[in-house]
Structures are given as structure tokens and as C-alpha cells.
Amino acid sequence: MSNREVIIPKGMEIVYERYRYCPGIKIGNTLYISGQVGRDENLQVVEGIEAQFVQCFENVKKVLDAAGATFDDVVEMVTYHVVGQQATEEAQPFTIPHLQLFMQVKDRYFTNQFPTWTGVGIACLSMPGLIVEIKCTAVLDLD
């Protein structure tokens, strides 16, 4: 079996120490990134829908950078979106709230290579106020 390398970017040590999970694990040339949410280095939920989407992608970027990868290396993205009563009112043509805005933010980060993507609507996330979680898998070049 290939070596297992734990990836803990600067500023994310608190999630490992407090919650006992790794932001990323690299095995061989495959990087598994834990679900990243819209909270800052102090574990405070970022206010504002677009700001929270941006923070999620910035957190994914921190893990990618720490592992020597980029968004071009991401082959799979799974996103979990909190849905609620507002979903039926605001989410046309999608059932996930704010999905159009999420896709606009996503496109700022994925500019060359696009990953597979599964978007899932859920009832809630781990902390009040969180609206999305992004989990990625990346395959790095073996150079």
C-alpha cells in the first residue's frame, strides 16, 4: 500500500486538534479532501451567501495548495446544500437554493479542467448557519 500523508494546512490545525479529522489525506497521487464549509480559521461561520461559498472554495484551495495540487487536479466534487422551505420559493429552476450563484462562484475556481460533480440537498450541516459543504478528490501528476 502507498504511504498515507496527512494534509493539515496552516490555519486548519484546529479542526484536527478539536474535531480529530484531517482536512486532507494523500495516498499515492490521490488526494482526498474532507468536506469544507464556510467558516474561517477561528471556526466562525462566514456571513453572507456568496461569502460563504467563496470561503468554502478558499478552504478547499488551502488543502490543495498544501498537497501541491490545484483545482485542475480535482476529478470529483460532491456538494451538500442545505435546503428548506425557501427552496420551493427561490430555487427556480433548481430545487437547491442559490445553486445559480454557487455555480458562478465555482466557475471562478474551476477555470480549465472541470470535475465530476454531484450536488445533494440536505436538511442541515454540522453547525447552525452553514449552507454548503464541498468534498473533493484530486489526482496529482506523478512528476
Feature names for model-found ranges:
Residues 1-76, 81, 85-143:
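N-terminal presequence-like segments and the immediate start of the first folded domain
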